[in-house]
Amino acid sequence: EAADPSTLFYNPAGLTKLEGTQATINLNIVAPNVKYKDGKAYYPDGSEITRAPDGSANVERDGKITDDVVIAPHGYISHQVNDKVWLGFGMYVPFGSGTEYDENSVLRYNLNELSLRTIALQPTVAYKVNEQHSVALGVVAQNSKAKLRQYANFRAFAVANGMAVANGMADGYAKVHGDDWGFGYNLAWMWDINERARVGVNYRSKVEHNLSGDAEWHLVGPGFANPALAPRIRGAGYAEKEDASVKITTPESLSLHGMYKIDPKWNVYGDVTW
């Protein structure tokens, strides 16, 4: 509808509908509650996972994937320079992800923890071509931070090196974290067909990140009581700490949306996004 500066996110060409200087602040609260029950998983030899990383039978088959409450702030400001030009600035959270299994979970050999946080800053200029058409261009500066944890079963490595270790007794895990700035752009067009109907197109480019940081391998299973096992694993490239990078690309999107005013009290809206 282009009723306030948050139109900068949905279709920044709508800034030309705003008078003077305006600002808006929004706060989204996401409280997921995802659970699993009677989980089963298997070692590479086909036997069922029955041990926790410490080698005990305290393996969890029920649990939560995540229960973190996430607060996502959004803030926008617009300023009308003259009858043709508008400026806008937005700070928003375009993408995020959070998954974490308990470290004793039977599902720990999946990606055990994933945390992705992004925040975008977008300066924008909008131009009113005529009474029916407006266009806009925005530059997106996006900061991303990621944290990953992945468990691994080193039993096969131990056996290949002549050490007798039972399944679940030689667990280790990797922790990787990094951050990066990436850049993209936003293009938009809005067409007032008549006083009652309006359509718009909004394109948001992909943003590529090469998150750089640290990777750490932790060897936690009781099988590492064998003094020969850990040095051989370290020597095979599983360093205690080293530089690491993670490539993440946030997707592009193309939206077509419209509004139709039925009467002074009722509007109908539609949106299709690829």
Can you name each region flagged by the protein language model?
Residues 4-6, 12:
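Acidic, small-polar-rich N-terminal luminal/periplasmic segments of exported/outer-membrane proteins
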Residues 3, 20, 43-61, 69-274:
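Outer-membrane beta-barrel porins/channels
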Residues 16-35:
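Transmembrane beta-strand segments of Gram-negative outer membrane beta-barrel proteins
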